[in-house]
Amino acid sequence: MAIILGIDPGSRVTGYGVIRQVGRQLSYLGSGCIRTKVDDLPSRLKLIYAGVTEIITQFQPDYFAIEQVFMAKNADSALKLGQARGVAIVAATNQALPVFEYAARQVKQTVVGIGSAEKSQVQHMVRTLLKLPANPQADAADALAIAITHCHVSQNAAQISETRLNLARGRLR
């Protein structure tokens, strides 16, 4: 069993999603958004750090998965996003959580099957995979999709490692 916290970082809205993985089964534990309504960036970053720390304390995750920075057309936006990611990662590492990063295209490919999927498609698939009664809000859905991606990637890595080990032992040909 593992609990995974997914984070969709943003300087104004940071989505989070928490799921439990038992074997191949995924179950929803919680999701939402950390909203920063103040104008100055240092105060927003402090709120993101405090919010992520509170979520970690509440859910006690085993793994922390976060979206990688993409190259935005606006350099200022990319820098702010990078800073928001940074404080979220520091909150995780301060709690000794292993941090995993996934590109947005990889998340969409894993959850929807198309790397260029629309937000509504991600929301629908997250709802379906986690058997939710309604679509989660967009930022929370993205965070849940990041957590789901971590489950799939780590599960595939474990299967590959097991296959390599069996090959080395001469059990597979």
From Swiss-Prot:
Q: Which cofactor does it need?
A: Mg(2+)
- Where is this protein found? Cytoplasm
Q: How is the cofactor bound?
A: Binds 2 Mg(2+) ion per subunit.
From its record, what is one biological process in GO terms? Answer: DNA recombination
Q: Any idea which positions bind Mg(2+) 2?
A: 67
List the coiled-coil residues.
Answer: none
Q: Supply the alphabetized keyword list.
A: Cytoplasm, DNA damage, DNA recombination, DNA repair, DNA-binding, Endonuclease, Hydrolase, Magnesium, Metal-binding, Nuclease
The entry marks the following residues as binding Mg(2+) 1, namely 8, 139
Residues making up the signal peptide according to the UniProt record:
none
Which superkingdom? Bacteria
Enzyme Commission code: 3.1.21.10
Name of the protein in its database record: Crossover junction endodeoxyribonuclease RuvC
Q: Which organism is it from?
A: Klebsiella pneumoniae subsp. pneumoniae (strain ATCC 700721 / MGH 78578)
Source lineage: Bacteria, Pseudomonadati, Pseudomonadota, Gammaproteobacteria, Enterobacterales
